Amino acid sequence: MVVMRAKDLLGRSGEALAADFLENQGMRIVDRNWRCPDGEIDIVAIDGDTLVVAEVKTRKSLDYGHPFEAVDAAKLARLHRLSSSWCRQHQLNAPRRRIDVVSVIDNGVVEPQLEHLRGVC
């Protein structure tokens, strides 16, 4: 039996909330938790004619800073490279791509708070 750590459970829950949120914004989710040797993409979606790679950051509180603060230039560069790898693996020519970040704050008591930054890179 595999037991997930609380941090991992929170992250999975946040990713599910983010996927639902993005679908409600009109996006079509085409992949989740895609992995390759260079890293992982949380969510891949289509928004009109644009391929969207969404990074999801989930926290219980703001005690250690806003989730957006965890996405630095190195992470954005990695996501850009990963988006190219995803397109190669899926034999998809996606001239229009963007990277979005979704912040989820879920303390388990009140309704989770989601924020969405479009086109951060």
Curated annotation (Swiss-Prot):
Q: Which residues cross the membrane?
A: none
Organism domain of life = Bacteria
Tell me the InterPro entries matching this sequence: Restrct_endonuc-II-like, tRNA_endonuc-like_dom_sf, UPF0102_YraN-like
Q: Name one GO molecular function term.
A: nucleic acid binding
Give the family this protein belongs to, as stated in its UniProt record: Belongs to the UPF0102 family.
Q: State the protein's name.
A: UPF0102 protein AAur_2443
> What species is this protein from?
Paenarthrobacter aurescens (strain TC1)
